[in-house]
């Protein structure tokens, strides 16, 4: 069977499952109170379905495109990204995302994978940072960033999450992320902790990991970026966080802003020791 057709069948099947189990758009998302899931529950069925199709993750297509973009000379300077230093030396992608976010001396900043790739695209290839930041997801050069993210994170799959807060700026970013995680506000008086600070919570049929604990943080951080079946595309962590802000009815965060990187630092460091399973496959 043609691989594209197989992917189409997988996507359609999962989309149908989602349509049958999701409320209408007019319903506001609510975190269900902790409850014991019965044997053979829909949650268990979804878990089995994910395991069944794990070898056919459509994120593989983004990964292949990202590898090509990484190696191809592009931009005003017509150079590739193969000299981009993601923290383990110029051009090294193996294991890089497992140790991000981290402090980079050349920018004097803590950066996540996406902000670091933007730095490389600006410095090495000559692109305009503002054009990437304001482009929107899946648009312009931001789309290239997303594809390269898929390529890079796939090269850490199976490795342990190993994020440091030894540098003062890393520690500062971690504390900012923790504060942001528990900050409560907006018209719904929500925070990240409203959904992700207790065990046993669910929204619709989706289990909500407790990000304040190592196991939950590893599940949350370790499986993103991921292919999102319900939307039919690949979501980076920046996009995942952007959608969390939307669900809380907060203003949309600026792409690769300090606050989004800080939240990533908090989640990643809390999940240290867990396994990187990216790119994941999500509802």
For each feature predicted by the language model, list its residue ranges:
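Short, charged low-complexity linear segments at domain edges
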Residues: 51-68, 158-178
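Bacterial N-terminal signal peptides that target proteins for export
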Residues: 1-8
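Repetitive helical segments and hydrophobic/amphipathic motifs
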Residues: 12-13
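C-terminal motif of bacterial Sec signal peptides marking the signal peptidase cleavage site
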Residues: 17-19
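Electron-transfer interface patches adjacent to heme c in soluble/periplasmic c-type cytochromes
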Residues: 29-61, 71-147, 157-158, 183-283
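Hydrophobic, well-structured mid-protein blocks that either form specific transmembrane helices
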Residues: 148-152, 165
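Bacterial signal peptide processing site
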Residues: 21-23
């Amino acid at each position: 069977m043609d691989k594209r057709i197989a992917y189409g069948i997988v996507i359609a099947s999962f989309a149908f499952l989602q349509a049958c189990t999701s409320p209408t758009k007019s319903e506001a998302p609510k975190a269900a109170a902790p409850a014991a899931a019965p044997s053979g529950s829909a949650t268990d069925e979804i878990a089995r379905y994910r395991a069944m199709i794990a070898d056919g993750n459509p994120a593989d297509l983004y990964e292949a495109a990202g590898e090509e973009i990484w190696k191809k000379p592009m931009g005003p300077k017509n150079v590739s990204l193969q000299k981009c230093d993601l923290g383990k030396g110029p051009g090294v992608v193996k294991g890089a995302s497992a140790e991000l976010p981290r402090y980079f001396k050349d920018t004097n900043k803590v950066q996540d994978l996406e902000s670091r790739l933007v730095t490389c695209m600006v410095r090495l290839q000559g692109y305009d940072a503002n054009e990437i930041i304001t482009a929107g997801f899946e648009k312009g050069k931001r789309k290239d960033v997303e594809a390269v993210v898929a390529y890079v994170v796939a090269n850490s799959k199976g490795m342990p999450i190993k994020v440091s807060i030894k540098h003062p700026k890393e520690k500062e970013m971690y504390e900012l992320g923790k504060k942001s995680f528990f900050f409560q506000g907006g018209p719904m008086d929500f925070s990240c902790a409203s959904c992700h600070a207790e065990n046993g919570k669910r929204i619709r049929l989706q289990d909500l990991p407790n990000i304040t604990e190592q196991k939950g943080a590893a599940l949350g951080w370790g499986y993103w970026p991921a292919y999102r079946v319900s939307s039919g595309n690949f979501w980076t962590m920046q996009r995942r966080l952007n959608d969390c802000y939307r669900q809380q009815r907060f203003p949309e965060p600026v792409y690769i802003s300090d606050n989004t990187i800080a939240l990533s630092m908090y989640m990643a460091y809390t999940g240290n020791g867990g396994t990187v399973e990216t790119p994941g496959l999500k509802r």
